[in-house]
A protein has these predicted regions:
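A helix-coil-helix interface module used to build multimeric assemblies
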Residues: 1-213, 220, 224-232, 294, ...
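Glycine-rich anion/phosphate-binding loop at the beta-strand->alpha-helix junction
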Residues: 193, 240-242, 246-332
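Alpha-helical coiled-coil oligomerization motifs
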Residues: 158-161, 202, 276, 283, ...
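Active-site-adjacent "gating/activation" loops or surface patches in catalytic cores
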Residues: 223-247, 251
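Amphipathic alpha-helical coiled-coil segments and their boundaries
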Residues: 134-135, 142, 183, 250, ...
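Short, well-ordered beta-strand elements within core beta-sheets of diverse protein domains
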Residues: 181, 255-263, 388-395
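Amphipathic alpha-helices that form helix-helix packing interfaces
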Residues: 43-46, 102, 149, 153-156, ...
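Catalytic-core signal marking the mid-to-C-terminal active-site face
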Residues: 2-29, 64, 293-448
Length: 448
């Protein structure tokens, strides 16, 4: 069966491919190979810049030509690497052999080919390529999308900042709030967690077979290979080298990244559920698109499917992110291979997260504020001003104010404006205080 959108096992590459296409540049097999080629080429160039004695005569004018190997890397090149891998049964060695083939196409480079992948182990390439792909995926796809979501929420918060709304705690009426402020809660939370995500250090392992630069040092003991590695990883890759490692990355900093992403996802799940509830409460209507069907049986249905889709995808993303954060830092002795297959799945939570954020945005942009229903609920719930009244009575040293309001409002009888005002008139307080109390309504008792 040919692989296409209909035959793909994962919905990320099937049903939702249109939403996740940009991630292929960072997390596909093709992308991983390209990143590996990039790291190998930049490493070779850095050895030339050192220079190693055998590379001192390498023509620096050829650096752009070498960088062209990964800048112009295409699917045909990636397939060549896969063909080589069928023989080597080793993915990183296949990349090395591919680069050597590319060197053969450039006159005069034959003498330098053995300095491709010089002194390195596969994880020096993988544990730089993967964090680099994550870093660039965050910067070029994830951050812009989450910032677009925050901007949409900010727009609604500004637009509805003066709309009073009945709050619900424990599912029951509570002191009124403002719709714009409730949306600002999510703007604040997402902005703060995005800041923390951006502050996560993006680190890489680069130190030879067991993290000690054994091969480098035995061949060229005159060089400070730790300083070389620090400079290469920082200046050429924009990452930070982990100073003490086994054969593989410690993955602690990647764990921080995944945990930060999970917190952001959890906030969006909370947002999805809240707007789902607001729609259920009829505080929002949804824009209807001609031709769409909400139910195969019930023609009237207009369901909050975008928020539900988002919630489901974020649940999957969080499960994988939690596993990645817990599993990757654990490896037997100086290394086992379990991280290898796990690392190939780092794009999965990105994919589900990208699907989710686009769905949340779509759901938000369908919203139509139903002012009448919000106002109706406020008008029908005068009991919520009890807090205001008892607080002012406390200020006035009125005896047992809380208990008085509790006796009035904690019944199964509906509290109306008339009921509240009649109660106020019975209070032994000044006319000025009575007027102050009478002026309080569910519409204006919204705090600051």
């Amino acid at each position: 069966m040919k692989l296409d959108l209909l035959t793909a096992i994962s919905p990320i590459d099937g049903r939702y491919r249109g939403k996740t296409e940009p991630l292929a540049d960072y997390f596909s097999e093709y992308a991983l190979i390209r990143y590996r080629v990039r790291v190998e080429i930049e490493y070779f160039i850095t050895l030339c810049e050192l220079p190693l004695p055998q590379l001192k005569n390498f023509d620096h004018a050829l650096f752009d030509t070498l960088r062209g190997i990964y800048l112009n890397f295409n699917e045909e090149n990636a397939q060549r690497v896969k063909d080589i891998e069928k023989v080597t049964n080793h993915d990183v060695k296949a990349v090395e052999y591919f680069i050597k083939e590319e060197f053969d196409k450039i006159v005069g480079l034959d003498a330098y080919k053995e300095f491709i992948h010089f002194g390195l182990t596969s994880q020096d390439i993988n544990n730089t390529s993967v964090p680099l792909s994550i870093k660039e995926a965050l910067e070029q796809t994830y951050y812009p999308l989450i910032e677009e979501l925050i901007a949409q929420l900010q727009q609604y918060a500004d637009e509805w900042k003066d709309v009073p709304m009945l709050a619900k705690t424990h599912g029951q009426p509570a002191s009124p709030t403002r719709l714009g402020k409730e949306i600002m809660v999510y703007v604040y939370r997402l902005t703060e967690q995005l800041r923390q995500l951006k502050e996560c250090r993006m680190t890489a392992k680069f130190g030879g077979a067991t993290g000690n630069y054994n091969a480098h040092h035995v061949a060229y003991p005159q060089y400070d290979w730790k300083e070389f590695g620090n400079r290469f990883v920082s200046e050429k890759l924009g990452l930070e080298r982990e100073q003490y490692t086994t054969q593989i990355s410690n993955y602690d900093c990647l764990g921080s990244v995944f945990d930060a992403m999970r917190r952001i996802n959890t906030i969006i799940i909370d947002l999805d559920r809240d707007f789902w509830m607001y729609i259920s409460m009829d505080y929002f209507k949804q824009k209807i698109k001609a031709g769409e069907v909400g139910s195969s049986a019930m023609p009237h249905k207009v369901n909050p499917i975008d928020f539900e889709n988002s919630e489901g995808n974020l649940g999957i993303a969080n499960a994988v992110l939690q596993f990645l954060a817990m599993k990757l830092p654990v490896s037997r002795l100086q290394r086992d291979l379990t991280d290898s297959t796990v690392l190939r799945n780092v794009g999965v939570p990105f994919g589900h997260g990208m699907i989710a954020m686009q769905s949340t945005l779509k759901g938000l942009r369908k919203l139509i504020l139903h002012d009448e229903k919000i106002e109706e609920d406020l008008n029908n719930t005068w009991a919520v001003v009890a807090e205001a009244i008892q607080t002012i009575l406390r200020r006035e040293a009125y005896p047992h104010p809380y208990e008085a309001l509790k006796a009035l409002t904690r019944t199964n009888k509906k509290m109306s404006e008339e009921t509240i005002h009649e109660f106020v008139q019975t209070l032994n307080v000044s006319d000025a205080v009575k007027a102050e109390l009478m002026a309080i309504t569910p519409h204006n008792y919204t705090g600051i």
